[in-house]
Structures are given as structure tokens and as C-alpha cells.
Design a protein with these regions (language model features):
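Post-Walker A alpha-helix
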Residues: 201-202
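A noncatalytic interaction/capping subdomain that flanks phosphate/NTP-handling catalytic cores
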Residues: 2-6, 21-194, 207-211, 218-360
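Conserved lysine of the Walker
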Residues: 198
Length: 360
């Protein structure tokens, strides 16, 4: 009798991540093993038969996600990214598979390069660390080394969170590069380029009694009329310059974000007792920030066309989804956009408060 199962060249594969070590067998080797009724040692260079025994369901931004992996460290990392989120939206679950394999290097892999062609999104750091996402089917497959997983921030930011968010923002939401804060049920998007001060102003507003939603990535839920935004209020990320505004940041460690990124200070909002947080808000106003060479502090109209293209430029996906997202941006900008020119945080908070309460 000819037995057949997945194993390495050293024996049965108790860890599926080691299964690529067995070489392809010759016909003579297979014939000999069958004649002797010995197990056939099959190679799996494509990782097509890897066992992914660890399974769990998470709710990133409130959307259901089913994950399977051969590493408990992946589940720990996912829990770190999405703790606190419960099911908010009744949608078919996204699917994520993560295979972790051994590697010779213990170094953190390089920053991945990301590309999208039609319904396939890829993110490739090197030949051993990459992800492939089918945005049409809502499924993603990730292959990582143990070295990559050991650098948890890198693994979470560039692969686990990136794959999940790419599915969410090409199906059920419209992503906008904006912080979001809420005062008495009035949500305000704080827009701007990187370094515009979105995180700083959002955090300052939260200290002044606003509800903190997110510091830089807002997701408008598609096909709704109430301009509902969902964000990750579990964390805030600042540039080192923010230490001059907030005393509590003065003793925080400045690190290279996710091992290869920009210098930053990362803060978990759960450690702050004086900050109110929420995952959702209904947006009433869109405000672009301008704190460069301000001669007069004021809130003025901002060109709607400029605001629209600023939001459109980050979108990718299938044509039908892009059509929906374009209409959602038009809905968010239904009342136009504003520009907040300021040099004082206190003045900016007071002026935004007036906008939220009085509508002007």
C-alpha cells in the first residue's frame, strides 16, 4: 500500500512552515517507496498544502474577518491591532490566511512595495515576505518569515493591517486621509497632507472635551445617507514636534515607526483617562488645516474641487466600487469644505467648537 502525507525531509511536518525543505522526488524514488510501502515525502514549494490550524474571527473597524494561520503570534498581533472592536456591520466576512515560515535571517525585512492591477493587490518586501489580496473576492493570503513576525509593529502595519484595510476600503468604505473628532454629535474631518497637524489638533480637541475618533485615517461607510465615519480610536501617532504642545508626551520614546518609517511617538488612548473615544461619528463639516505662515487666524471657504481631488487621488479598486466612492465623496462635500488658518491650538479648538455648535 502506498501511503501519502505532507512532511519534511526530516519527518512528518508538525510545523507546516517547514514543509518547503523536501526536494522533489524522482520516479525511481517514488517507485521504491511504494514497493516498500513507505510514506511518500512530498515537497510543497508552493505552500499549497500547508496546514493553518489556528482560526479566529476579528472585527476590524466593525467588519467581520475570518483568519487562519499556522502561528499563534499572528493571532496575538491581530488582537493588538483590533482589540475593542465589535461587530458593527452585517457584511459577509473577509478571509485572511497567513503562513509563517522559517528563514535564515533574523533582520527586519525591508519596506514592501505595493501595486494594484484590476482586482489583485500585492505587497512585496522580498521573496519570502509578501501578500496577495483579491479585492473582488474579499480574501487575502500572506506569506511571512518568523523574522518578520518577530518585528510585530512591522508585521502589523505593512502586512496584517494593510491587507485587511485594502479589502475594507475597496468594498464597504471610502477612505479619506483625515483625522476625525466629534462634539455633541457633530463630526468634523480634519484634512491635510502628511505633517499638516491632523494628529496634534485632533488630540488637542479630545483634551478639550471632544470625542476622539481617529488621528489620520477616516473611513466613510458606503451607501448611507448619514455620512457615517468609522476610525481606529485605539491609538494616536505624533511627530516628535508634538512634545512641545503636550507635556505627557515629553517622556515618551521617539521611535522609527514600524522599524523602517518616520520618527514618531505612538500613544494608546486606552491609557488616557481624560480622553473620550468612539469608533464612529456622523460628519457635518470638512476642514482643511493650514498652519504655515499664517498672517491672520481665520476659518474660510476651501475650494470644493480641490478637496474632491485630494480625496479621490487615494482611491483604487473595481469600477463599480469607485463609482460608489466618488458619490460618497460628493455626499461628504455636499456643504463644501473649509480651511482653518491658525497658529494657536487654543484658538483653533475654540473656532472648531463654534463651527460644531453654531454651524458657522
Amino acid at each position: 500500500m502506498c501511503a501519502q502525507y505532507l512532511q519534511t525531509d526530516q519527518g512528518p511536518a508538525t510545523d507546516a512552515s517547514k514543509s518547503d525543505g523536501a526536494p522533489m522526488l524522482t520516479i525511481d524514488q517514488i517507485r521504491t517507496a511504494c514497493d516498500r510501502s513507505e510514506p511518500i515525502v512530498l515537497a510543497d514549494p508552493m505552500f499549497a498544502r500547508v496546514d493553518l490550524p489556528f482560526k479566529e474571527t476579528f472585527y476590524p473597524l466593525g467588519f467581520p474577518l475570518e483568519i487562519e494561520t499556522n502561528s499563534e503570534d499572528i493571532l496575538i498581533a491581530m488582537a493588538e491591532s483590533w482589540h475593542g472592536f465589535m461587530k458593527l456591520f452585517d457584511t459577509p466576512p473577509f478571509r485572511l490566511s497567513v503562513c509563517v515560515q522559517d528563514s535564515r535571517s533574523s533582520d527586519c525585512p525591508p519596506m514592501p512595495s505595493s501595486r494594484v492591477q484590476q482586482h489583485i493587490a500585492s505587497s512585496v518586501a522580498d521573496s519570502e515576505n509578501f501578500s496577495i489580496t483579491d479585492i473582488a473576492q474579499g480574501c487575502s493570503s500572506i506569506l511571512l518569515t518568523r523574522a518578520a513576525v518577530a518585528h510585530q509593529d512591522y508585521c502589523r502595519y505593512f502586512f496584517l493591517e494593510s491587507a485587511v484595510l485594502s479589502m475594507i476600503c475597496t468594498s464597504y468604505t471610502t477612505p479619506i486621509q483625515a483625522a476625525c473628532v466629534d462634539l455633541e454629535g457633530c463630526g468634523v474631518l480634519l484634512c491635510g497632507d502628511s505633517g499638516a497637524g491632523k494628529s496634534t489638533l485632533a488630540y488637542a480637541c479630545a483634551q478639550a472635551g471632544w470625542t476622539y475618533i481617529t488621528d489620520g485615517a477616516s473611513f466613510v461607510v458606503n451607501s448611507r445617507h448619514d455620512r457615517l465615519v468609522v476610525g481606529n480610536s485605539n491609538q494616536a501617532c505624533f511627530r516628535p514636534a508634538a512634545q512641545e504642545f503636550f507635556q505627557e508626551l515629553s517622556d515618551k520614546l521617539v521611535t522609527k515607526r514600524v522599524d523602517v518609517g518616520k520618527s514618531s511617538i505612538e500613544l494608546k488612548t486606552s491609557s488616557l483617562r481624560n480622553i473620550a473615544t468612539s469608533y464612529i461619528s456622523r460628519v457635518n463639516h470638512v476642514v482643511f488645516l493650514n498652519r504655515r505662515e499664517v498672517k491672520r487666524q481665520e476659518l474660510v471657504r476651501f475650494p470644493t474641487e480641490v478637496a474632491r481631488y485630494f480625496m479621490l487621488q487615494r482611491l483604487y479598486g473595481l469600477p463599480d466600487t469607485l463609482t460608489v466612492q466618488s458619490s460618497m465623496i460628493d455626499r461628504v462635500l455636499g456643504a463644501g469644505a473649509l480651511e482653518l488658518r491658525y497658529s494657536s491650538l487654543d484658538w483653533a479648538i475654540e473656532r472648531l467648537g463654534r463651527l460644531a455648535v453654531e454651524g458657522e
